[in-house]
Amino acid sequence: MRFGRGDFKNLEQAEERCFLLTNGLGGYCSLTLAGGNARKDHALFMGVEKAPNCRYHYLTNLQESLETEKEVFDLSTQRYVNWTKNQHGYRYLQMVSPEDIPEWVFEARGITVRREIVMVHEENTVGIRYRITAPEGTKAVLKVCPLLRCSKKDEEPKESQSYLLGEKTLESDGKRLYYETDGTVVPLKEERISDLYFAYDSRDGREAVGMVVKNHEIRFAVSGGTREYSLIYSDRPVEKTVRELMEAERLRLLKLTETAGFQDPAAVRLVKSADQFLVKRESTGGDSIMAGYPFFSDWGRDTMIAVLGCGIETRQFERVKSILRTFAFYCEKGLMPNLFPEGESEPLYNTVDASLWFVEAVYEYGKASGDLDFVKEMLPNLESVVNWYRKGTDFHIFMDEDGLISAGAGLEQVTWMDVRYEDILPTSRHGKPVEVNALWYNALCILAELSENGHEYETLAETVKQSFLE
């Protein structure tokens, strides 16, 4: 998949699409295809303190400019509160390829700048490679200025926060960020830029203004011909080259697609995309699935639905088992977590359907993998879900006399239509939602097949069927 000059005719068009790289821990690298920040949660380097939902915003972006002996070309794309400061680097974009190792090609006055970005799997590390090609006799310098943030994902940097640049390190907010580059590092007078404007946040009613800090730049020079340079940031000392990091990621993606076994190019792309949402969960030492980037963490409903495509169809069976064990570990009174909030907060359980999707996920895993031992391991959890729903659990979730499941009361949001504005639920859906009872019937049919008490569940399933049809 490639995008060309015709896809970046103006700033609005340059912000329409984004790319996403993830590290399997909840961290990510995500900007617009033109390389800008259209949301405050966009970041060149969003790391993780505790996987997957204690995230840390290290670097917002890299400001890039190409300087010749006569001209300066600003390659960055970004909006500001004062629109006269807007950067229009998309005008120099010739090509963007966002797949696998994303690549950008800029061209100005016959000088070509190629940029590639990689995020290392299960590490807080991001690597950038530049290839600069200039005509014979032409001297040019690519200046790259990191836009520093160094704060928790949903917090602004402190006013008093310092940014200490050392040899191969940057220290701020009690953290040390390591960097490795073959360019020339030039310290700058610290500058706080507090008027970045995020157009898509503004449309959503979110806080649309943000700040970053500049205190150094890296210079990459070329004098005719082609030069290759690299820049790596990590929360640990850098031991590998960008070339090695990229080769390792390509090999990982190749093994992933070989395991899935698909030949169709679209299916192969989907396998790679699905993998971006699989993450480690430190609290259990297992796996989970992110509901979406850049906003969401791992949600129960989303995970149980997504595991069918992100794990089972792609034949990531060990990870599927780990995901199901993770949510079984957190099950309370028959309820799977609705979501794990950003940070250290306890999980929330206001969902009626996540547990029923869990039953379906275990069943589908068993059919696809043939791993009946794991299904037997999970069977007590499946029966616990159904039994709690029968006798009643939290959030007014209970089986009514007709066998159907009723859920929710007051301000409780228990289905996927969970919008709440102050004390108003525009779509409360309290009572007996149709999809919930379809899932309930499905869960009973599954237990009728798997449980030693199958006849009991079969009888109840028939009652539910009749009540549903009536």
Walk through the language-model features, giving the residues of each.
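Substrate-binding groove/exosite segments of carbohydrate-active enzymes
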Residues: 196-212, 217-221, 228, 256-363, ...
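An acidic intrinsically disordered interaction segment
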Residues: 88-99, 183-197, 258-279, 317-328, ...
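Short loop/turn segments at secondary-structure transitions that flank enzyme active sites
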Residues: 148-150, 235-237, 280, 342, ...
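Terminal accessory carbohydrate-recognition/targeting modules of carbohydrate-active enzymes
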Residues: 1-262, 294, 301, 312, ...
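Non-catalytic carbohydrate-binding regions of carbohydrate-active enzymes
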Residues: 2-12, 337, 341, 393, ...
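"Short basic amphipathic alpha-helical interaction patches in structured regions
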Residues: 143-148, 158-160, 323-325, 341-342, ...
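Extended, well-ordered alpha-helical scaffold segments
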Residues: 242-257, 262, 266-273, 315-328, ...
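The feature captures the catalytic groove of carbohydrate-active enzymes
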Residues: 125, 194-218, 226, 334-357, ...
